[in-house]
């Protein structure tokens, strides 16, 4: 297995566990649904992580379950990675596994990070690396670029500073 693949799978499993209790349109609000037996509420744990600016969940038209988590910087992402919740779930799925140093490729002074975790469920397990019935799993990291527009609000949390973002919302609204 290529270096770095297993950590992505592990993070994906953690996302899967969190999404099992994640609402989609028409569902109950987060925290009102029962979590999988013995699984923590990952969305709540992400939101409670120092430096996490906000969390959103979604289900795409293609069937992906997605968590969007915005962090102030690399330090904040590492706080989540090393949190008790995250480590406990990693150990639960892969006990005794040694992990490489996370975020080695991410510069220390790079600013905010958007982590997008997605998973697509399948009828049966497809990968030897995990017993999960999935066809796809991914953890991707992104950074904001200058520009964009908004009117009446943004998808990103207000605490995320985007250079040269044009806000057309009338004052007082």
Where are these regions (language model features)?
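Aromatic-rich, lipid-facing transmembrane alpha helices and their immediate juxtamembrane interface loops
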Residues: 6, 29-30, 34-44, 100, ...
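Short, glycine- and small/hydrophobic-rich beta-strand elements in well-ordered beta-sheets
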Residues: 34-66, 95-107
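Short, well-ordered beta-strand segments in beta-rich or mixed alpha/beta enzyme
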Residues: 58, 62-83
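Boundary at the C-terminal end of the N-terminal hydrophobic targeting segment
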Residues: 21-27
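Positively charged n-region of N-terminal signal peptides that target proteins for export
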Residues: 1-5
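Bacterial N-terminal signal peptides
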Residues: 7-18
């Amino acid at each position: 297995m290529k270096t770095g693949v297993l950590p992505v799978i592990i993070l994906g499993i953690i996302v899967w566990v969190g999404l099992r209790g994640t609402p989609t349109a028409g569902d109950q609000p987060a925290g009102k649904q029962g979590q999988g037996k013995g699984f923590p509420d990952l969305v709540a744990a992400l939101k409670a992580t120092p430096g996490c600016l906000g969390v959103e969940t979604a289900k795409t038209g293609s069937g992906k379950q997605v968590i969007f988590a915005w962090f102030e910087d690399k330090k904040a992402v590492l706080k989540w990675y090393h949190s008790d919740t995250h480590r406990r779930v990693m150990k639960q799925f892969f006990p005794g596994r040694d992990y490489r140093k996370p975020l080695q490729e991410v510069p220390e002074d790079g600013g905010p990070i958007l982590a997008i975790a997605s998973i697509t469920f399948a009828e049966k397990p497809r990968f030897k690396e995990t017993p999960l019935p999935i066809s796809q799993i991914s953890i991707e990291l992104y950074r904001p670029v200058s520009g964009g527009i908004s009117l009446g609000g943004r998808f990103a949390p207000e605490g995320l500073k985007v250079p040269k973002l044009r806000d057309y919302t009338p004052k007082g609204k």
